[in-house]
Amino acid sequence: MTYNQPNNKGFYGQFGGQFVPETLMTAVKQLEEAYVDSKKDPLFQAELKELLKDYVGRENPLYYAKRLTEYAGGAKIYLKREDLNHTGAHKINNALGQVLLAKKMGKNKVIAETGAGQHGVASATAAALFGMECTIYMGEEDVKRQSLNVFRMELLGAKVHSVTDGSRVLKDAVNAALRAWVAQVEDTHYVMGSVLGPHPFPQIVRDYQAVIGQEARAQFLEKENKLPDALVACVGGGSNSMGLFYPFVNDESVAMYGVEAAGLGIDTPHHAATITKGRPGVLHGTLMDVLQDENGQMLEAFSISAGLDYPGIGPEHSYFNAVGRAKYVDITDEEALEGFKILSRTEGIIPALESSHAIAYAVKLAKELGADKSMIVCLSGRGDKDVVQVKERLEAEKEVKK
């Protein structure tokens, strides 16, 4: 059966929808209309395609990781190299599309939330390219963890607003950005960074990120003359994974694995394994799986990776899980650090801590699948932003061992 989600109300099965105050409903409807028009507009599509090619550097390679495959001792591992994009991650695919859409709608300001800083950098980059004003909302904790990315955003002309509410991380940045959008909706577009938020955001972000899977599918067919047996990608909000998964959704022979952050372990309070440990609830304008206590209070998400510590997951992922189209697994901080080191040493590629979760799971899965199988792993970003954090962590561990 051909997949055709979301429905016209923005639901993926029971998940999704538009749970926003009346003050935002007009903006959300306007965005929906503009987006539908842009899909039919050949000039818009041509401009986006040209930017992805000449500015982002697409298409990026599908790389056979021979030494990583040998290390894992099983299935062939191919890496979709989103780390090679301009700005160093998959986030630019979506940011460019949305800022171009904002321009089409006649808006001259953009705002965005960011966790690890990658989406903030991508949004600031796209805003600079189009000469737009840009404000980025970032939790105070993440501002500390990712000071280099904060400087990058400011260098690109963006104002970085440090959010001191709540636990001062990604979910608080989203809250602040949504509040700011309500106040200036006439001339401002909110560049949602993941497959989250009220409809049409999850669909827009999915469609702009689907270039990952479209390229990977064609590249794999060309190299192997068949489809892969499995796809593996890390999941926070879930945009790089949805970008990889969506073009394969009707290929039933292809298994999909979304890798959540298990932090210090899913049996501790310190993790971000939303599908494994969460249940449906409304957060940031959409119904999805969220981490909550028995009274429905939001729980804090925790991960070594600033890009994965979000207490929800895109509604389409919740739907994939509910219908069994994708399987959601988890990797701890320790395992992710090991993945970070393994890829660096076997392939000379330093991955982002987010992507390291996918690498760590891919090594496990390769052993299970066996040598006659193959997989594509989304290498969603490069690790430059994480090198200092990993260095400090490993040095601290050495001290403890002494």
From Swiss-Prot:
Keywords, alphabetical: Amino-acid biosynthesis, Aromatic amino acid biosynthesis, Lyase, Pyridoxal phosphate, Tryptophan biosynthesis
Keyword Lyase listed: yes
Superkingdom to which the source organism belongs: Bacteria
Cofactor needs: pyridoxal 5'-phosphate
Gene Ontology annotations for the cellular component aspect, listed alphabetically: cytoplasm
Positions of post-translational N6-(pyridoxal phosphate)lysine modification: K91
Pfam families: PALP (PF00291)
Chemical reaction(s) catalysed: (1S,2R)-1-C-(indol-3-yl)glycerol 3-phosphate + L-serine = D-glyceraldehyde 3-phosphate + L-tryptophan + H2O
One function term, GO molecular function aspect: tryptophan synthase activity
Pathway(s) per entry: Amino-acid biosynthesis; L-tryptophan biosynthesis; L-tryptophan from chorismate: step 5/5
HAMAP family assigned: Trp_synth_beta
Similarity comment text for this entry: Belongs to the TrpB family.
Subunit structure: Tetramer of two alpha and two beta chains.
NCBIfam families referenced in this protein's UniProt entry, alphabetically: trpB
Role noted for this protein: The beta subunit is responsible for the synthesis of L-tryptophan from indole and L-serine.
Name the record gives this protein: Tryptophan synthase beta chain
Organism: Lactococcus lactis subsp. lactis (strain IL1403) (Streptococcus lactis)
Gene: trpB
